[in-house]
C-alpha cells in the first residue's frame, strides 16, 4: 500500500497535533513508534476492509480479523424502544469498544460511541463515532454533533474513564469516571445502562504504566502499546454483563454529579457477581 493511502500514520498524527514536537523527535524514535503500534500491519487490515464501514466494518473486525467471542449476559432485558446511555469500564483499549458496538448494534441499528478525535483517522468508524478532542478545545461542530445525537433516539455508548484501565493495588480498574454522562442523562432524559466488561491487558502494560508514573512522566506513553495489546487479545472470550437500566430521575440533588458517577462505577464493578442487582 502506498504511503499516501495510509490510514494510520504516526508521523502525520504528531505533525497535525504538534508540528514543533515532531521536529524534535529523532527519526529512529518515529521508526520505533511505527513498529510499536504495528503501523504496517494495521494499515494492511484497514486497506483490506476500506470498502465497508459502520456496523459492517465492526462485524468484520470483531468476528473475522480478531475473532473476539463475546459472552453476553443481561442484554436480553434491554428494551429497544427506550433511549439509553450505555456506560462501561475500559479494560482493553479498543476491541472491547468495537465488540460493544457489535452487541448493541444487533438490537439498535444506529449506535454512537463517544471517542477521542484521534480515532477519527479510521474512516470506516465515522458513522458510529462522536468525536471529542481531549487534547484541545472541542470545536463547535463536534459540540453540535454531540447535542444532535443526544437529542436523537440513537443509543449513546461511553467509556466514562476516557482512558484504559490501570492496575492499582493489585486490581485492574478504571481511573476516575468523568461525571459528564450523569449530566447528559438528566439533560436529555436518558436511562443509563451499566455494563461490566471482564477483560484485562498484559502484565507488561500495567508494569510500564506504573513505572512511567513512578518516575514522574505525565505523558500517557503506554498508549503506544495498545495495538500490541489488541493483537495479544485476539481469539479471546470476552464477557459482557449488562445491568438493569438506571432512570435519569435517580440522579437527583442528594448527590453531586461526580458522586453519582462514582456510585455508578462501583455498581458496574459489582455486576460480574450479580448483573440483576438494582442500583443502590
What are the language-model segments listed below?
Residues 60, 99-106, 183, 187:
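Residue-level signal for well-ordered alpha-helical scaffold segments within enzymatic catalytic domains
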Residues 2, 10, 143-280:
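Non-catalytic C-terminal accessory region of glycerolipid acyltransferases
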Residues 1-84, 97-99, 126, 280:
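Membrane-anchoring hydrophobic helices of lipid-metabolizing enzymes
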Residues 39-41, 84-138:
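Catalytic core of membrane glycerolipid acyltransferases/transacylases, capturing the structured
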Residues 65-72, 138-140, 223-224:
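Short gly/ser/thr-rich secondary-structure transition/capping motifs
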Residues 65-67, 108, 124, 187:
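Short, well-ordered coil/turn elements that cap or connect secondary structure elements
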Residues 61-67, 132-138, 170-171:
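Short, flexible loop segments at the rims of nucleotide/cofactor-binding pockets, characterized by
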Residues 73-75, 114-116, 132-133, 243-245, ...:
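Conserved beta-strand termini and adjacent loop/short-helix elements that scaffold enzyme active sites
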Amino acid at each position: 500500500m502506498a504511503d499516501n493511502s495510509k490510514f494510520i500514520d504516526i508521523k502525520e498524527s504528531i505533525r497535525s497535533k504538534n508540528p514543533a514536537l515532531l521536529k524534535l523527535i529523532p527519526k529512529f524514535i518515529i521508526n520505533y513508534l511505527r513498529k510499536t503500534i504495528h503501523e504496517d500491519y494495521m494499515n494492511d487490515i484497514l486497506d483490506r476492509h476500506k470498502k465497508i464501514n459502520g456496523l459492517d466494518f465492526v462485524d468484520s473486525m470483531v468476528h473475522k480479523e480478531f475473532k473476539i467471542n463475546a459472552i453476553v449476559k443481561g442484554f436480553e432485558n434491554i428494551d429497544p424502544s427506550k433511549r439509553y446511555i450505555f456506560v462501561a469500564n475500559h479494560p482493553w483499549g479498543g476491541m472491547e469498544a468495537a465488540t460493544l458496538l457489535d452487541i448493541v448494534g444487533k438490537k439498535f441499528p444506529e449506535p454512537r460511541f463517544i471517542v477521542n478525535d484521534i480515532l477519527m483517522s479510521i474512516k470506516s468508524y465515522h458513522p458510529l463515532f462522536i468525536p471529542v478532542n481531549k487534547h484541545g478545545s472541542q470545536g463547535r461542530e463536534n459540540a453540535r454533533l454531540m447535542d444532535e445525537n443526544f437529542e436523537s433516539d440513537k443509543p449513546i455508548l461511553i467509556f466514562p474513564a476516557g482512558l484504559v484501565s490501570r492496575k492499582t493495588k493489585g486490581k485492574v480498574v478504571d481511573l476516575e469516571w468523568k461525571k459528564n454522562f450523569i449530566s447528559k442523562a438528566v439533560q436529555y432524559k436518558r436511562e443509563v445502562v451499566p455494563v461490566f466488561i471482564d477483560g484485562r491487558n498484559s502484565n507488561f502494560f500495567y508494569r510500564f504504566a506504573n513505572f512511567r508514573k513512578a518516575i514522574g512522566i505525565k505523558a500517557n506513553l503506554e498508549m503506544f502499546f495498545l495495538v500490541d495489546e489488541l493483537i495479544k487479545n485476539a481469539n479471546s472470550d470476552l464477557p459482557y454483563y449488562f445491568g438493569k437500566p438506571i432512570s435519569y430521575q435517580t440522579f437527583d440533588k442528594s448527590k453531586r454529579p461526580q458522586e453519582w458517577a462514582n456510585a455508578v462505577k462501583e455498581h458496574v464493578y459489582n455486576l460480574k457477581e450479580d448483573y440483576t442487582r438494582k442500583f443502590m
